[in-house]
């Protein structure tokens, strides 16, 4: 306790030593004002006040300055000061702005707010293009709080999760800061170099706060919050918003500012509510405070997200630019709840420096030398927004106990508690961990892989694993083994694999595996074991067709250059046909029987689907992520796909040295896929495939190309870009040239939000088209229309589609129930 108190005093003293201009900002009732903008007049040198109303403005030269205090809802205050030496204390008291309608001339023919917003919308593109390029300094602080943490989560104790929380199991979960240099070039180039990074409780941590994550420009038609949210000044904003003029006031430069209330026309549209402040005659944004619910944004964990932006005008540059931004949010999911905020301060804009396309490569984020090693002296000197008492306390507590938490005695004590073997571990799995040496070993629950098929009967798999993490570059060694036993065929099968990851920059992996397993003829696994178990036992439809594979395989994958990856394998395979060994069902239909285990001849029993054979198999696959950008962390490279460009896959597969020459083959394949947003019109995706075989007339069925079918009326994926939902699983399998197309458009509420009653449900309309063509067979097509985002409150894992199929005329239709949560279970 004494040690922490001493540290607290030292921190406060260091604040005093390095604060240049500092002070406290209150209202007329002496209440602290957070998020006040403080800057030097006619410059972009500034800061904001923290939650407790304190601020620090770092200046190097004693001189005469005019300091501006600007806060929404309060009159702007200017104070001219002459500084002879630092530190200098300057407090401010702000009076509430008298916002009135007295000076507004009301036209009874049209809402005055509509007139203002029409002019702002008409000027949107002009204002968007005013800023072509700049360099600036950027500061960010991210904080996430958690409240009332449950003692257990799915039976697991959360004691180690409690560090830094109070007696109510509440407190700061994450606290981090960055100081950066950023460069921008219109329309969408943004590059950031992080000079300093700090994470509470991790002296070696690198913050994930970035300028690109909060690059919200409301002059664009939409704002990207995972989904595209429509701006109140979008070209088509009047289709989504109503507006009300709440009043006007004059800023410190004499500009008339209109306060406009932003009102959603429909409560569940992807739109904001709140206030936007528009400068009269210039029709630019002066400030905004806009909120959106998690339901509107279709972000299940989020309750409310609020964005606050403040702008300042420079007479020198004749520009309005953003000087501060705050993002506040609240969340709740699975019993966890809390809130957080993200504070961003932009300063020292430079519009004169030449910034061109040559200034930008694919790297959008980098770190300076020793960015995570800056000491408290550095932070106390250059941090533009003072820490609150809560944040100071979190840094002191977590930094002081970090050494203890990383020590061997502490980690061993935690492991001793968590590694205790309990009787329930026999059924639900067990994990043993050595945290100090960073390795773990264990096995999974045999219940998680319990399933049924007509070849093995009831069967289960026991998976064993070992993993050793090696260093800060995220190298690791992973070893896995599995044993599967089928009761009906009375056969034990086993596999083993070894994976070594060399680093997290190019992500090279070396993989070795081998053993004996059952494998679906279509190795894309078109039907999951769980769904096949249900369809077999309850409906006597054994759609899964499998064979016995003995194999040994070596593989390697790596990113060669940014956006270009290779994946190659060489394998020995011995394939053997399998037969049904059980006809068990829960509900026996005398008019229905199980089909055989031969996909091509489901009504022929007792004859092998193919002759036992063996071969060597070589695969070389490449992936081109065109336009891919990336973030460079000292220990990692994080790739950022560019939705403006597609991803291209090209592959070559060769079967050779087969026990029978007929099983040798060559195959070339390609795939092109892309997903991109169309603003308020939703999201469009496509997936195109093509391939051809050579010398493949009599190859094994498992080497054919199989378009993924579905005969169960159940879907499990979030989209249907790789499946024909009304096609038998092996009806179009081919060993010749083929072309496959999947197209899907999600309107994201564009149409259903306009339908009375349906617009209350927050559903999304989805349409799709699918086609497959191969030699000597009439082309096959499917067309679908469906509703997505079905569920209750935050849990929206359901989707329903109606599908019609055609092949030389109408073939049939089906209703598909999308149970997306099955992906999580499996």
Residue ranges and their predicted role:
Residues 44-54:
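Short, acidic Ser/Thr/Gly-rich low-complexity loop/linker segments typical of extracellular
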Residues 305, 456-460, 490-494, 548-552, ...:
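Residues that define the transmembrane beta-barrel architecture of outer-membrane proteins
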Residues 128-130, 421-424, 428-441, 454, ...:
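Short loop/turn motifs that connect adjacent beta-strands in outer-membrane beta-barrel proteins
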Residues 262, 290-294, 439-452, 468, ...:
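Transmembrane beta-strand segments that form the barrel wall of outer-membrane beta-barrel proteins
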Residues 98-99, 103-257, 263-271, 334-451, ...:
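Structured extracytoplasmic
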Residues 20-33:
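Structural motif
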Residues 509-530, 534-547, 607-608, 640, ...:
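C-terminal outer-membrane beta-barrel translocator/porin domains of Gram-negative envelope proteins
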Residues 40-42, 68-78:
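A short, solvent-exposed loop/turn motif at the edges and junctions
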């Amino acid at each position: 306790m004494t040690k922490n108190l001493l540290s607290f005093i030292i921190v406060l003293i260091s604040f005093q030593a390095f604060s240049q201009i500092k002070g406290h900002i209150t209202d007329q009732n002496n209440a602290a004002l957070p998020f006040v903008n403080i800057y030097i007049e006619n410059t972009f040198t500034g800061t904001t006040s923290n939650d407790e109303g304190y601020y620090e403005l770092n200046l190097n030269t004693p001189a005469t300055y005019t300091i501006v205090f600007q806060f929404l809802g309060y009159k702007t205050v200017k104070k001219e000061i002459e500084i002879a030496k630092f530190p200098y204390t300057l407090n401010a008291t702000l009076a509430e702005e008298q916002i009135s309608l007295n000076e507004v001339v009301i036209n009874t023919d049209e809402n005055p707010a509509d007139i203002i917003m029409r002019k702002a919308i008409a000027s949107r593109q002009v204002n968007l293009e005013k800023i072509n390029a700049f360099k600036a300094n950027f500061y960010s602080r991210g904080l996430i709080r958690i409240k009332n943490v449950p003692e257990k989560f799915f039976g697991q104790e959360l004691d180690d999760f409690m560090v830094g929380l109070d007696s109510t199991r509440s407190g700061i979960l994450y606290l981090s800061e960055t100081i950066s240099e950023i460069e921008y070039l219109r329309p969408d180039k943004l590059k950031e170099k992080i000079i300093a990074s700090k994470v509470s409780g991790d002296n070696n941590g690198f913050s994930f706060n970035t300028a690109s994550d909060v690059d919200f420009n409301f002059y664009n038609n939409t704002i990207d919050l995972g989904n595209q949210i429509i701006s109140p000044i979008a070209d088509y904003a009047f289709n989504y918003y109503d507006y009300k003029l709440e009043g006007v006031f004059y800023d410190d430069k004499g500009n008339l500012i209109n306060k406009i209330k932003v009102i959603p026309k429909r409560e569940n549209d992807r739109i904001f509510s709140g206030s936007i402040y528009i400068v009269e005659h210039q029709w630019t944004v002066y400030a905004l405070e806009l909120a959106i619910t998690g339901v509107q944004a279709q972000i299940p964990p989020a309750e409310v997200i609020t964005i606050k932006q403040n702008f300042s005008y420079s007479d020198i540059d004749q520009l309005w630019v953003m000087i501060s931004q705050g993002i506040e949010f609240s969340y709740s999911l699975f019993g966890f709840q809390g809130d957080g905020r993200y504070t961003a301060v932009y300063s020292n804009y430079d519009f004169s420096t030449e910034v061109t396309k040559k200034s930008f490569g694919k790297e959008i984020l980098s770190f300076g030398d020793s960015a995570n090693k800056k000491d408290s002296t550095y932070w106390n000197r250059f941090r533009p927004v003072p820490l609150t008492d809560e944040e100071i306390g979190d840094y002191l507590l977590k930094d002081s106990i970090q050494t203890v938490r990383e020590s061997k005695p502490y980690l061993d004590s935690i492991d001793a508690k968590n590694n205790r073997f309990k009787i329930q571990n026999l059924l639900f799995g067990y994990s043993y961990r050595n945290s100090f040496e960073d390795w773990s070993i264990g096995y999974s629950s045999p219940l998680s892989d319990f399933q049924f098929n007509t070849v093995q009967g009831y069967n289960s798999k026991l998976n064993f694993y070992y993993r050793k993490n090696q260093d800060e570059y995220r190298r690791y060694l992973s070893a896995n083994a599995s044993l599967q036993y089928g009761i009906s065929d009375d056969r034990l099968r086993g596999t083993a694999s070894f994976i070594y990851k060399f680093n997290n920059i190019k992500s090279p992996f070396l993989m070795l595996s081998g053993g004996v397993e059952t494998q679906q003829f279509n190795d894309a696994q078109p039907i999951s074991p769980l769904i096949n178990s249900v369809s077999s036992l309850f409906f006597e439809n054994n759609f899964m067709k499998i064979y016995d594979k003995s194999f040994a395989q070596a593989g390697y994958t790596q990113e060669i250059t940014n956006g270009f990856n290779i994946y190659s394998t060489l394998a020995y395979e011995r394939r053997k046909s399998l037969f049904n060994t059980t006809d068990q069902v829960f509900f026996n239909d005398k008019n229905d029987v199980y089909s055989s285990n031969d996909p091509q001849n489901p009504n022929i029993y007792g004859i092998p689907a193919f002759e036992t054979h063996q071969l060597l198999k070589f695969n070389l696959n490449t992936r081109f992520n065109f336009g891919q950008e990336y973030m460079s962390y000292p220990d990692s490279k994080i790739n950022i796909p560019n939705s403006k460009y597609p991803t291209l896959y090209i592959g070559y597969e060769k079967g050779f040295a087969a026990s029978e020459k007929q099983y040798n083959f060559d195959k070339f394949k390609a795939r092109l896929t892309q997903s991109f947003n169309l603003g308020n019109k939703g999201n469009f995706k496509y997936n195109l495939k093509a391939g051809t075989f050579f010398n493949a007339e009599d190859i094994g069925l498992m080497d054919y190309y199989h378009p993924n079918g579905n005969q169960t009326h159940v879907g499990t994926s979030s989209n249907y870009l790789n499946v024909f939902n009304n096609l038998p699983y092996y009806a179009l399998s081919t060993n010749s040239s083929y072309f496959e197309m999947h197209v899907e458009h999600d309107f994201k509420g564009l149409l259903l939000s306009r339908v009375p009653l349906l617009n209350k449900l927050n559903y999304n309309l989805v349409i799709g088209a699918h086609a497959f063509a191969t030699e000597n067979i009439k082309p096959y097509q499917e067309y679908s229309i469906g509703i997505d985002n079905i569920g209750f409150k935050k849990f929206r894992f359901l989707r329903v589609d109606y599908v019609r199929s055609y092949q030389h005329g109408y073939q049939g239709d089906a209703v598909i129930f999308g149970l997306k949560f099955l992906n999580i279970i499996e």
